[in-house]
């Protein structure tokens, strides 16, 4: 469970990685020191026009310098993410975090692991790959994109990288599961983050082969702390908070065992 707090962070740098994809480094007081792979932060716009913050996953964690890297997609004009993209080094931004539960690193210790990332689910796989270095995991990074790729050079330095693109412009033509089949890949443990159709296919693959699988779910979030129930997903267990079969993605997740949830 996260030890969350709200603070004012300072933007260290920002750059565009591809069309609509931006990378931002933040200097924090405490948030970076507490963060683990798979968690996220809520970022607030500065003009007060939007009451709800935007949840953004953590791409890299630099505890020594108390810095966090977020990589996010601009979702349209006059959106919170569009406002973030116009900010520059030295600007201040309010954040809440770290939020949610991260990936269990110990599950991959000394094993062959798949790290699946799809679309804006690619960024959190980078810090996970870096931290899995410490437990001798054999990492196979399988990243899926619609067309334009990003973060590939960083990924290559942290494992064996396989790429799938929908248009076939880079790597395997198709999706991440097509890349697994094309390269005859196998694994003992799976970590994944991405859109629901991708996670559903990975969940099915893992269950059929009795592979331990952790998935990070992407749901629209409002409060980010589990109070509003806007981001629930269906679960196989009775939730103690709502007394129904669901889980709050922001608080109980976003990382779940694939056997825990319905996608």
Regions found by a protein language model. Name each.
Residues 2-89:
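Ferredoxin-reductase
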Residues 5, 246-263:
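Short, basic/aromatic-enriched C-terminal tail that caps enzymatic domains
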Residues 124, 196, 219-254:
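Local cysteine-cluster metal-coordination motifs and their immediate loop/turn environment
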């Amino acid at each position: 469970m996260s030890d969350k707090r709200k603070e004012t962070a300072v933007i260290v740098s920002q750059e565009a990685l591809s069309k609509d994809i931006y990378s931002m480094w933040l200097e924090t007081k405490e948030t970076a020191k507490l963060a683990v792979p798979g968690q996220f932060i809520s970022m607030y716009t500065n003009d007060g026009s939007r009451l709800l913050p935007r949840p953004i996953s953590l791409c890299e964690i630099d505890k020594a310098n108390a810095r966090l890297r977020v990589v996010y997609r601009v979702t349209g004009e006059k959106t919170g993410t569009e406002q973030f993209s116009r900010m520059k080094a030295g600007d201040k931004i309010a954040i809440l975090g770290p939020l949610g539960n991260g990936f269990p690193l110990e599950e991959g210790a000394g094993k062959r692991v798949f790290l699946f990332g799809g679309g804006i689910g690619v960024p959190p796989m980078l810090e996970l790959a870096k931290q899995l270095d410490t437990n001798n995991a054999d990492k196979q990074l399988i990243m899926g994109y619609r067309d334009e790729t990003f973060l590939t050079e960083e990924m290559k330095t942290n494992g064996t990288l396989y790429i799938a693109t929908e248009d076939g412009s880079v790597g395997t033509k198709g999706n991440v599961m097509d890349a697994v089949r094309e390269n005859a890949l196998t694994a003992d443990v799976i970590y994944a983050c991405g859109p629901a159709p991708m996670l559903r296919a990975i969940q099915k693959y893992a269950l059929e082969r009795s592979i331990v699988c952790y998935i990070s779910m992407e749901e629209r979030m409002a409060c980010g702390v589990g109070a509003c129930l806007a981001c629930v997903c269906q679960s196989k267990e009775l939730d103690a908070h709502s007394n129904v079969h669901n889980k709050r993605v922001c608080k109980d997740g976003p990382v779940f065992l694939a056997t825990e949830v319905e996608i």
